[in-house]
């Protein structure tokens, strides 16, 4: 994933989550990326302090994604007058356990953070219940580097 590009897009709105092992993650608007070793200071000093943010990061990092590899299947423009930023990239995987295809879509802005060498995997996380007690499932793309280390995540859009 392109950390510098993500950092520029986040600006001062990003939040930093530090794990107990010392790894730091920059998170903003459903996207998170591991802060590379050697990066000491960022502009924003905010911390991820709510339970859901920490739960998502911990779930992403500890997820077993070995058999959930995603492949880009299509790009969709929902409005014929839309711009390039309105393109939704749809990824699919076939999970061996359930033998069904799972889809997750991300917007072109988030797609631009990915690199060719990134390995993309699928993850679902149940969100906290809302005020009506309903729990929704959030789909994520978990991004691994070429060595299989988790380096980021992108929350999927509900349009797909």
Enumerate the language-model features and the residues they cover.
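C-terminal functional regions that serve as terminal interaction/effector modules
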Residues: 21, 28-32, 36-38, 43-160
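Intrinsically disordered, low-complexity linker/loop segments enriched in Gly/Pro
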Residues: 1-22, 27-35
């Amino acid at each position: 994933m392109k950390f510098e590009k993500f950092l520029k897009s986040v600006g001062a709105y990003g939040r930093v989550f530090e794990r107990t092992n010392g790894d730091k993650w920059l998170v903003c608007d459903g996207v998170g990326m591991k802060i590379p070793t050697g990066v000491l200071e960022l502009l924003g000093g905010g911390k991820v302090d709510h339970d859901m943010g920490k739960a998502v990061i911990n779930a992403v990092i500890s997820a077993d994604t070995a058999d959930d590899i995603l492949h880009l299947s299509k790009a969709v423009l929902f409005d014929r007058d839309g711009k390039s930023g309105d393109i939704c990239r749809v990824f699919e995987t076939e999970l061996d356990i359930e033998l069904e295809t799972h889809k997750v879509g991300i917007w072109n802005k988030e797609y631009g953070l990915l690199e060719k060498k990134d390995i993309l995997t699928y993850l679902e996380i149940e969100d906290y219940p809302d005020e009506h007690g309903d729990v929704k499932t959030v789909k994520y793309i978990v991004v691994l580097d070429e060595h299989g280390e988790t380096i980021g995540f992108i929350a999927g859009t509900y349009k797909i």
